[in-house]
Amino acid sequence: MKRRRPLFVLGIDGLPAPLLERWKREGRRPALSRIGERYGLRSMDSSLPEVSSVSWTTFFTGKNPGEHGLFGFYDLDPKGYTPRFPTFPGLSSKPFWEEEAARGGRSVVLNVPSTYPARPFPGELVSGFVATEMEK
């Protein structure tokens, strides 16, 4: 079996690529610039709607909102049209780390938005933000 190279993804929510380029030109954020020079930087187009929870879910599933089922930080329950918070276990698509685990790979996933509550998989997952109660 061919050995696969490790993948490291550092996602910075809400950081526009032009701002990062300006910081690099101005000599600001040198550690981030060194990471980019050594490993490469890629920007991604946001999803529609342009909401962090939707964009991150689109990124980690490779599916659009109609396919993965998350359209925002809160939604309406189709049974009673009351507000509800979509949760990670309710997604209709698997994130890439679960797909990789099914092929025998190992993943460590830290603080990725829209991954609460964590669902079991053979790896480590520390859930990222979003609260699941409007009162909190």
Residue ranges and their predicted role:
Residues 21-59, 63, 106-108:
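Short, structured active-site-proximal loop/turn typified by the sulfatase FGly-forming signature C/S-X-P-X-R
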Residues 4-21, 35, 59, 100:
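Beta-strand elements within well-structured catalytic alpha/beta cores of enzymes
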